[in-house]
């Protein structure tokens, strides 16, 4: 059987650029071991957004060579080219975290290119990355969420005092303030009282034009890996135990320094009710957001009430050596390489389903 041509896209004009490089290293290594695909490594420059074809995915970002003769051109209806040569890509595995990677942008472009793509499509990606609209949709399905409000920068500037009053009355303090469309806890801060809230909101608006504010609670952090298209598999949840951090921020997530006091428990120590609730909510969340391929769905269990809440959804979860997503899959018997291979198979499956529909009518002369 001839090998399929696979393009691994990583990097990106994103705050999570460096995390993407680390994820890509793991996936590239797995693809090399599988030896089932001709792998084309596509690096997106953080500053310019230019796409470069690399020989491999280096462990050290400093070794990435941005050769002008290796600039990638994408021409809808024709293909993906380097130096006027069609690479004849059969499937793309995007591992660009955050904006342009998880917001439906790359997914939309690949749909126009008519190339199968690992992971969710435009709709699921675009909704999931926007914390505010995602929460509004999940709320309409009666899925339990941490109490929240959201607003645009324009509305906030028109009525600062009214919004601050709403925060006090609806949520009370402390609250956690988040940019609506960023991951890896970037731009997130905690306001413990009214004197701190304005600074926290302004910091979040530096990253996004929409801000989400949630009630801050003492809670256990539970994560759940999900894969599949129509048929969905929910993996055994894991727990993140944070010892020296107020919340699971960027440093807690990605620091590899000795003494980083974050512990991963897989499986999470859950009673039967919590386990069933989390799996049920993960299933319905995946379905109602029309997710495909994979997702990591994060939960909170409030310590004071023992109630379970959906926290956030990641349509392209981290694949680094310390990421929970692959570790939860591995716990249930799906090792890293098999997971990567399965996700590629799901991309072909999703593409085939999409091609079954009628996209246009031919007019008879």
Curated annotation (Swiss-Prot):
The keyword Iron does not apply. It catalyses: 2 D-alanine + ATP = D-alanyl-D-alanine + ADP + phosphate + H(+). It is found in: Cytoplasm. GO terms for cellular component: cytosol. Mg(2+) 2 binds at residues 312, 314. Binds 2 magnesium or manganese ions per subunit. GO terms for biological process: cell wall organization; peptidoglycan biosynthetic process; regulation of cell shape. Its EC number is 6.3.2.4. Mg(2+) 1 binds at residues 298, 312. Its cofactor is Mg(2+); Mn(2+). It comes from the Bacteria. Cell wall formation. This is D-alanine--D-alanine ligase. It comes from Borrelia turicatae (strain 91E135). The lineage of its organism: Bacteria, Pseudomonadati, Spirochaetota, Spirochaetia, Spirochaetales. The gene is ddl.
């Amino acid at each position: 059987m001839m090998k399929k041509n696979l393009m691994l896209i990583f990097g990106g004009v994103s705050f999570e650029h460096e995390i993407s490089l680390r994820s890509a290293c793991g996936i590239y290594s797995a693809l090399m071991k599988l030896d089932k695909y001709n792998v084309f490594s596509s690096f997106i420059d953080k500053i310019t957004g230019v796409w470069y074809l690399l020989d491999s995915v280096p462990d050290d970002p400093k070794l990435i060579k941005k050769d002008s003769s290796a600039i990638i051109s994408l021409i809808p209806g024709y293909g993906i080219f380097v130096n006027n040569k069609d690479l004849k890509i059969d499937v793309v595995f995007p591992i660009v975290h955050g904006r342009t990677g998880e917001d439906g942008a790359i997914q939309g472009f690949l749909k126009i290119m008519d190339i199968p793509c690992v992971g969710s499509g435009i709709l699921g990606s675009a909704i999931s990355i926007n914390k505010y609209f995602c929460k509004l949709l999940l709320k309409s399905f009666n899925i339990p969420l941490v109490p929240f409000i959201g607003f645009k920068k324009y509305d906030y500037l028109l009525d600062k005092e009214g919004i601050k009053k709403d925060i006090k009355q609806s949520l009370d303090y402390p609250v956690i303030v988040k940019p609506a469309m960023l991951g890896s806890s970037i731009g997130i801060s905690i306001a413990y009282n009214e004197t701190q809230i304005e600074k926290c909101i302004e910091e979040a608006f530096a990253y996004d034009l929409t801000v989400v504010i949630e009630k801050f609670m003492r809670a256990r952090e539970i994560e759940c890996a999900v894969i599949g298209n129509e048929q969905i598999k929910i993996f055994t949840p894991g727990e993140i135990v944070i010892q020296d951090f107020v919340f699971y921020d960027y440093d807690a997530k990605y620091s590899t320094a000795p003494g980083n006091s974050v512990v991963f428990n897989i499986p999470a120590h859950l009673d039967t009710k919590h386990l069933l609730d989390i799996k049920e909510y993960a299933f319905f969340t995946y379905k109602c957001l029309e997710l495909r391929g994979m997702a990591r769905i994060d939960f909170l269990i409030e310590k004071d009430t023992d109630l379970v809440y959906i926290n956030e959804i990641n349509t392209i979860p981290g694949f680094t050596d310390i990421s929970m997503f692959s570790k939860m899959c591995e716990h249930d018997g799906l090792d890293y390489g098999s997971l990567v291979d399965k996700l590629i198979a799901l991309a072909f499956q999703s593409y085939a389903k999409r091609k079954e529909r009628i996209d246009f009518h031919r007019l008879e002369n």
